[in-house]
Amino acid sequence: MSELFVQRLTVLDFSYLDVERGLVGESWQADIVLQGDLDAQGMVLDFGDVKKITKKLIDEQFDHKLLVPESSPAFQQASECLTFTFNHGKKIIHCAPDDAVTLIHADTITPETVSRQIIDTLMPLMPSNVLSIQIHLWPEKISGAFYHYSHGLKLHCGNCQRIAHGHRSRIEILRNGERDNELEAHWATRWRDIYIGTREDLIDETDGDYRFAYTSAQGAFALQLPKSDCYLIDTESTVENIAQHLADALKHEHPEDDFQVRAFEGVDKGAIGRA
């Protein structure tokens, strides 16, 4: 039996629900190994077909989505809305078109449970000579500060318009031209497992919750979650606006200093803000 591998086939940028952490933005890189017999070309599968079949499926069914552990007792589904109750008693209510959510056949979301579902979904699409698939999902190795955030971009023409998708992101802050690790750690802590919401999309609030809603090209979206898990900004939560928001906030707090912020959106991409 022969083996074929592709490292960093794609990156999944998504959010998921966890009974302890709440709504978590995440970014996982995907490696794949195909095991099987050689075909008439002397290949397990042509690399072009690997990307066409596997990357396409992963991107369509798992990327830029809300992943929900459907076996968790915290999960309840009613029509287009789902409710997920956290261990601390608070809850999230998410309403969206079906394409914005993927139910994972497990009680928790982990690289292993998601990998298993990707494999189960992929195998029926493989040619008969492919006998098994291995998927390795892994987060970027980050030595410095990072945070997990979720958001939705109602004006985006692609899947970023989904109200609860997210990223695991590095942050780099230059203060007068020098890295400031303390400020990086401060914002990473402040934005740990945060939902960055646009004030314009905030349609209601109670003592404990915010409710965001908008209609975009893909349909109607709504999200209710604890205020303590949210951070409000005045603009769309694009990475360009996030980077500039951070730079402006730092300048406001330290007006005598100059700042450059590199805010990442997942792996190896992002924007720069200056103030």
Language-model regions, residue ranges each:
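Charge-rich, low-complexity N-terminal segments
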Residues: M1-A275
